[in-house]
C-alpha cells in the first residue's frame, strides 16, 4: 500500500473510531452561567498531594488544588459526548440564534455553485450526511455580535465568553499559586476580571470580535482582542496534489486537541465545497477561509478571469455553509504593486499575488476594494467577520517594514472603518517576516492606523535561515508581537515553505504557538495567567513528576523524555532526574538545607527558657544551618571533581540506578 493510501486509511480509521480525547488526570467540567443553557466547558487538571515529613519522621499530606485550563476541544474532550463525525456536533448556539427572531430559514441555498454541487449525483459519496438548511438575516436586520453590542445587548455568547476567559480563577486562593510578576501591557486593559459587560463594550468599540456565523451554531463562543487571552489559529486544507476529506477532518479534531482557538480551511484542491461542509459541521471552534482561493478554482486557476459575480457567489456559498470569518485582500491596490518590484521576495501572499495579477492584467482597481461595501452588506446578513488580508506582507526580513507593506496597512485602516458602518466585526492581518528590532513598529502602526481593531499575524518570522524549524523562528516573533498587543497568532509549522503539514506538524506548530501566546499573557500581566506556571513549578520542586507532566502543554512528550533515561517506576517518585542525578539535584539540596534548618530551629525553640533565649537559639540554628549547607556544598564539589568535572554526567544516574540501597 502506498504512503498516500496508508495515510488516508489511518485518517478513515481515526474518524470511524473517534472517541472523546482524554488527558491524564484531567476531567471536563462545565460552569453554568445565569441560565441553564449557558454551560461553559473547561478542563480541570487534578494534582496529587504534597508529602511532608516532619523532624520526627512523621509523614503527612497536603492537598494541592485542581487547576482549570482553557479548553478548545469542545465535545471532543467530553467523555459523556456521543461523537459521530457523520452527524456533526451538537448545535450549542441554535436556541440563542432562534430566540433573537431576526433570522429566517431558507428553503434552498442562495449560491448558484452550491445548487450545482447538490444537483450532481456523482458527489453523493463525498457529501456530508445531514446537510442543514441555511439561515440569513430577515430583511432590514443585522445579526452581528457587533450590532447587538452597539445596541447595549449582552448576548448569551458574551456571557459565555466572560466565564470562559476568567477560567474560575477567583476559586484559586493559594497564595503561592496566585503570585505573579508585574506585567507590561503596553496600554492593554488586562488587570481586572472579565465581565459580560466588559465583553460587550470591547466588541462595541471594535477592539474585539466574536466570530460566530449564524450558520455555525456548533461553535463555542470565543473572543479575539488584545484585552483578552491571546488566541492561536491553525491552518489546514487539502491541495491539488495531496490530502483528503478524511485527513482534513482528522486534522481539525487534532488541532482543537492541541489548542487551536480557530481553524482556517485553506483548501485549494478538488472538492473544496464538500471538504468545508464536513469541517464546519464538526468544528467546535470558528472556521475561517480565504474565498479567493475557491473563486480561482471556479475560473480554472486563471486569475485574469476572476470577476465580482464569481467572487460574490463564493461568499454566499461559504457564508451559508457556516464560515465564521473571511480573509479578504481588499488592500492590494493597483498603485501599490510597483512598490514591490525591488523586493527580494516580491509578493508572497497567495491572495495578494492573485489580486495583484488581476489588477495588472486589467489595469483596473482591485474589485475587492471597489466592491467592499457590497462585501460588508453580505457579511452583516450572516455575521461573518472580516479578516483584512495583508497581501503586501514581506516574505523575507530583507523586505520588512517597507513602503508597500505600510501603504496597504493604511488602506486596511480605512476599510475597517467602512466595515464598522455595516456592523461587521473586523480584524487586521499582519506579517510575515520581520526581524526582532522592527516588530514593535508593526504593532504601533497597526494600532495607530486601524483604530485598535484586533491584529492577527503570521508569526512574524524573525530570521530566514532555518527551513524545517520555522515554528521556532516565527514563535520568537509571535511571542514578542503578542506581548506588544497582537490579539491572535496564526501558527507556523515545521513544514512552512516546504510542504503541506501532516498531523505531527500541526501539533508541533500549535505547541510552539501556545507557548508564545501564554508567554505573552504572562508578560502582559493577565490575571491568572501565571497560576499554571506556579502550579507546575511547585510540582517540580516537590518532585511530583506526574503532576509536572499533566500540567504541561504536552504531557505525553514530557513523560516520554523522562522515561528515556529513567523508565523505572521508582523514578516516578525519585527526587532527581537524569540531568544532574541524585547527588547534584539543586532542588533536592535546597530541600535538605531547608529541612535541616527547620529541625535546628525547632530544637532551639524547645530548649528556650525565654524569648531572649529563643532568639539567640534561632540565630545559632541558622548559623549552624549555613555551616551544614557549606559542608554539603564542599562535599558535592569534591565529588564533582572526582568524577571528571563533567557538568552533566550520566555516571551519577547509572550509579543511582545500579543500587536500590542508596537513599534519594
Curated annotation (Swiss-Prot):
Zn(2+) binds at residues 433, 497. It is an enzyme of class 4 (lyase). Pfam families: ThiC-associated, ThiC_Rad_SAM. [4Fe-4S] cluster binds at residues 577, 580, 585. GO terms for biological process: thiamine biosynthetic process; thiamine diphosphate biosynthetic process. InterPro entries: ThiC, ThiC-associated_dom, ThiC/Bza_core_dom, ThiC/BzaA/B. Pathway: Cofactor biosynthesis; thiamine diphosphate biosynthesis. It catalyses: 5-amino-1-(5-phospho-beta-D-ribosyl)imidazole + S-adenosyl-L-methionine = 4-amino-2-methyl-5-(phosphooxymethyl)pyrimidine + CO + 5'-deoxyadenosine + formate + L-methionine + 3 H(+). Its cofactor is [4Fe-4S] cluster. Keywords: 4Fe-4S, Iron, Iron-sulfur, Lyase, Metal-binding, S-adenosyl-L-methionine, Thiamine biosynthesis, Zinc. One of its GO terms (cellular component) is cytosol. Binds 1 [4Fe-4S] cluster per subunit. The cluster is coordinated with 3 cysteines and an exchangeable S-adenosyl-L-methionine. Substrate binds at residues 235, 264, 293, 329, 349-351, 390-393, 429, 456. The keyword Membrane does not apply. Its EC number is 4.1.99.17. One of its GO terms (molecular function) is carbon-carbon lyase activity. Homodimer. Belongs to the ThiC family. Catalyzes the synthesis of the hydroxymethylpyrimidine phosphate (HMP-P) moiety of thiamine from aminoimidazole ribotide (AIR) in a radical S-adenosyl-L-methionine (SAM)-dependent reaction. This is Phosphomethylpyrimidine synthase. It comes from Shewanella amazonensis (strain ATCC BAA-1098 / SB2B). The gene is thiC.
